[in-house]
Amino acid sequence: MSGRRNETAIRELVQSVSGNNLCADCSTRGVQWASWNLGIFLCLRCATIHRKLGTHVSKVKSISLDEWSNDQIEKMKHWGNINANRYWNPNPLSHPLPTNALSDEHVMEKYIRDKYERKLFLDENHSTNSKPPSLPPRTKSSSQSSPMASTSTSKSRYADSLSTLHDMGFSDDSVNTHALEETNGDVTRAIEKIVQHGSSKPQKPSTLTSTKSTIKLVSARLKKRNKNLSVHFEDGTKPGDAYEVTGDTRAASPTLNPFEQMMAMTNQGMSVSPGVETTSSPFFTAPVEPNQPLQPLRPSMTGPVPSSMGSEATLNMPSTYGIDSNLYTNSNSSSIVQNPLQPARTGPAAINYNYTTNYSVSSPSVTNPFFDVGSSTQNASLMGSTGYPSSANNVYYENSYQGVGTSMSDNYQLPDMSKLSLNEQPAAPSNSNSQYMNTSMPTLDSTNMYGQSNQDPYSMSNGVYGSNYSAQPSTMQMQATGIAPPQPNMSMQMPMSMQSTGYQMPMENTWVDYNGMSQQGNGMQPATMNYSNSMGYDTNVPADNGYYQQGYGNVMMPPDASYTGTGSYVQPMNQPSGGMGAPADSSKADSYIQRIMQGKQ
């Protein structure tokens, strides 16, 4: 009920007292907040800024949401906006509100801080006696006559202020009362007095001793973490003298940090110090022997070479590759022979080559999958013999491969290309530059070009269908590449003889006019050939009966038996009727085609 009554009293102060209905800082209407220690009414925006100042400067409460005590109501009655502004800013013309304060939040905050926190607007000649009469000043005579009574009276007078100071953390009532008496109840100035009094007051010895012991304990804990402090007290003692911890203590303690263990092993020659206890770190489960050499890695695999491999072996590479090195340095006493490296070859199927090579190869342990080849019962040294053709029978190997034996490298010699034989056919033209491939091209008689003789250039007496087109066998030789030994005189016989059954086209243009109708417009006159006279063409045959086709100088089989000829097989180019050796009767076409396919006349 009292809270409700106090809320009504606060609202009456806002409505009845002039100036309280406006904000004390920005003069905005609609106040809903108040700073009860300053005795002013505020708007929402200015109340937010007052909260930023802290409770030691301004204590903000809501008019309707918070509860008000009687002392706080009396405080608001004594001050109000007009009286408070006269005290905090006695010269408003000298310190007016900035014009952009309503729009700029930072400008408004600076103005409020200068007014209440920094107190820049206070008049120097303004004294505390100009306070409202509701706060009577303390008289000197009364305070000197009865100090105990004045103290009790002051506590009763400043009960609200003392409770405020208690809320702010100032628990010494005597100091608080004395500060309030000096400032006539002004909490803000009393706080300043209390702060000044507390800073000038010397610290008690008991507090210093407890602080010193606390510092020693903290320093000892820090030194356990290997952090040295350089703090000295006035008596000359160092912090942590009672808690001296050496570095050996840290070393003797077990550690789980793999990097610290690595540093310890490095400093002690790759050996674990006796002080370090057994650790559960997975990085240091296996003991490390001092001065242990690093194991070599296996090629194309991860991890060291198995320790069972002891003796050394060498792999002799051919000198052609330019490699003469020991690739593997460890092997078992019982060596396993590898297959010797075979040179790459190109061309047809491989032929036995006769050369002798000695590879001294010692394979690593059979546990390595890359070197587990063959049986282990063979000897370490193998004289591999592969049949090369002997030098007496093959010109390619006159400078044959020499067996090197147990030397570090093999001497591969390329064949002497100058001794290369050229297979020249009697009819083929000779080419001195043909060293790599000798191919006999088909030869034609120079006196009988196009299969015709000089005496009979158009093959009047010789049948065209009986002409033979023959070619000499083609010889192709393969050339070796790389370091592979050249092949012996391998030749591929390619028979190319065949019977030509096609019609040999004449060398002239056969544009012929048949029955007054040209094949391609105005036909061209033949120069020397006369098919109707010399070749036995029948010009009375129609142009569209199947014998003659437009655009071709050739003839075809008749589509039907409309044209009847002699029916006898005669010389192909000398028939009175029927075209180009074709029988006039279609019943004999099958035998005629078979004869043509067999190359017979």
Curated annotation (Swiss-Prot):
GO terms for cellular component: actin cortical patch; cell cortex of cell tip; cell division site; cell periphery; cell tip; cytoplasm; cytosol. Residues 157-197 form the UBA domain. One of its GO terms (biological process) is cell growth mode switching, monopolar to bipolar. Residues 7-129 form the Arf-GAP domain. Residues 139-156 have a biased composition (Low complexity). GO terms for molecular function: GTPase activator activity; polyubiquitin modification-dependent protein binding. It comes from the Eukaryota. The gene is ucp3. Residues 123-158, 289-310 are annotated as: Disordered. Pfam families: ArfGap. InterPro entries: ARF_GTPase-activating, ARFGAP/RecO, ArfGAP_dom, ArfGAP_dom_sf, UBA, UBA-like_sf. It comes from Schizosaccharomyces pombe (strain 972 / ATCC 24843) (Fission yeast). This is UBA domain-containing protein 3.
